Amino acid sequence: MKYALAVNSGTSSLHSAFFGINLGPGDEILCPTYTFLATVTPIFQCYAKPILCDCEEDTGNICPKDIEKKITEKTRAIVITHMWGHPCDMDKILEICKRHKLLLIEDCSHAHGATYKGKKVGTFGDVGCFSFQANKIVTGGCAGVMITNDQEIYERACLLGHFRNRSFDTVKSEKYSKYSNTGFGLNYRIHPLAAAMAINHFRDLDNRIKIRNENLNYLSLKINELNTCIKAPITRVNCFRGAYYGYKPLYYGYEKWGVPPEIYAKALEMEGFDVGIPGSKPLHLLNLFQGGEKDLYSFRGVYRPLLNNYINYKEGDLPKSEYYYKHTLSFPTFTFVDKNVIDKFVEAIKKIDENKEELIEYCKINGCFKK
C-alpha cells in the first residue's frame, strides 16, 4: 500500500476509512454481525446505514453467500473483519465487489501478519485498518493505522482527524489542500509515545508470530487427540492466522453433557488457566442494533437523517452467528511459554472430561443443566 495514516485507535482508523471513501446519508454498507462493535459503530458518524450479515459456521467470518443476499441499489461498500486472525474468503468477496462495483474495507485488528494465499490481509481491499490496542501483538497502548493505495481516500481520511502540519504534509490535491489548516473537525493524531511503542513491537513481530503459531498449532493437535467436547479452531488451506489474536475453540458440552459453556470455562479457570467466553457478542443482539439508536438520534440532531430509517434486528435474524457465539470459548494464546505449560493445560481439559459427571451434577443442583 502507498499510504499509511497513523491514528489514536483502531476505531479511529475505521472512521477515517469510512469518511475517506465518502460514505454518507442514504448509503448502505454491508458488515459482519460477528465482530467487535468498532467495526461498525463509526458508520453512524457518517450517517450511513450498516446492513449486518451472518457468519460462516466454521470460522466466524462474514459469509459471502449472505453478502450476496443483502446487496441493494443503495449498497456502496463492504467492511469485513478477519476474526480472531483467520482471513476471510477473499476470492469470493473480491469477486462480489468487482461484479457489483463495491468498495472494500478490511478490519485487520485481529490479524497482524495474517495472509491469504501468501498475500497479507489489509492489502486486498481499498482500505486496510489495524488496531494497536493494549491486547494486540503490536501495541501502542491505544493506537491504530489506516492503509490505502488511493490518494483521495488518504487525503479525506487525513483531514477528518488531522490539521495543520500533518495535513500540510499529506494533502496535496487542489480539491482538498484548502482544508489543511483546519481539517474537518476531529483530532485523531497518534500520541508520540504510542507510536514509539508500536514501532518497537514491530522489530520482533515475525518471531513472536512464529512462536504463537507453533504453540497454538501444538495445542490444536493435542485437543483434537482428546476427542472430547472441545474442537480446536480450524485454519483453512492457504490461510495463515498471523498474530492469532484469539484462540477460540468450539464447545459442544452443552449438547453432549448439558453443561453450559460458562460453567465449563469456570472449571478450567479453577485449574489455573485464563479461560472465558469471548466478549464479541453478535451485533444484532445488542440494543443499539435493535432499535436502540432511535434514542440516540432523538437527542443528537446530527443523526436526524436516519430517524425514519433506524435499524431493528432481533434474536434469530442471523442464526449462524448466534450459534457460533454460543459455542465459542476463549483460551490463552500461549505466546511466551514452553510446551510443558500447554501440556498441563491439555491435562486440565482431560481431567474435566474424565470427571464430567461431577460437573453435570453441579449444573443440576444449580439449575443450569440442559436436559
What function would you assign to each model-found segment?
Residues 95-103, 145-165, 259, 263-273:
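Basic phosphate/pyrophosphate-binding loop/patch that engages nucleotide-derived ligands
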Residues 165-175, 218-229, 264-328, 358-370:
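Conserved PLP cofactor-binding pocket of PLP-dependent enzymes
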Residues 32, 319, 331-333:
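Short, proline-centered helix/strand-breaking motifs
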Residues 111-117, 124-246:
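Active-site region of PLP-dependent enzymes
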Residues 19-108, 115:
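PLP-dependent aminotransferase-like
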Residues 1-10:
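Conserved N-terminal alpha-helix of the aminotransferase class I/II PLP-enzyme fold
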Residues 236-238, 244-256, 275-294, 326-340:
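Conserved PLP-binding active-site segment of the aspartate aminotransferase-like
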